[in-house]
Amino acid sequence: MAIMKTTLTLALLLSLPALAGPKEELSKPLTTIVNSVRYGRDNAALKLFAAEEQGKLLVADSWAKGTDAQRKEFQDLFLTLFGKIAFPKIRKNFENLDTILYDEPAVDGAKASIASTILINHPLKKQELKVKYQLVKQGSAWRVVDVAVLGDSMLIGIRDDQVQPILKEGGWDALLKAMRDKAAELKDVQLK
């Protein structure tokens, strides 16, 4: 009887991850990104971004006009540039990370959003950041599409201030050239 009871208890405990609710399922990749960036595992963090969905949002109507090769190069360059530019700044902010509190997510099929409050316990001042994430389900995994800090969307800012003006001026060729040039400029910044 004791063996049967122990077996049932173990079976229930081992099945708990499979019973994780939407909040846990959606916050897991976010926590992985934060910890990966915080501890210098940049490439692990970049794998949790939905590069194609980001490209569609950034390039907007021009996405369909690009060739498969152009879209692929854009995705690769964007993730590389994002990691090299944003991650060092984020890493610095997360040196004093205290905790992240996630709200209940809003899930609509393969799309979801979840808000969080990031508490930074800096010795000189405590800081509270309100962050909202847009995610998309790819296969069985959730990937991050966009992040809004204090209501400002990262991708919309990049799209409106950088990507769209270059596209309007010179199309895909000019955009990819500008991205290649910026990547060359940042060649000494290593993704970890």
Predicted feature residues:
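Surface-exposed, charged secondary-structure patches
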Residues: 75-79, 83-130, 179-192
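Alpha-helix boundary/capping residues
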Residues: 14, 52, 61, 78, ...
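Low-complexity, intrinsically disordered terminal/linker segments enriched in charged
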Residues: 147-192
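Sec-dependent N-terminal signal peptides
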Residues: 6-16
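Short beta-strand edge/turn micro-motifs at domain boundaries
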Residues: 128-158
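N-terminal secretory signal peptides that target proteins for export/translocation
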Residues: 1-3
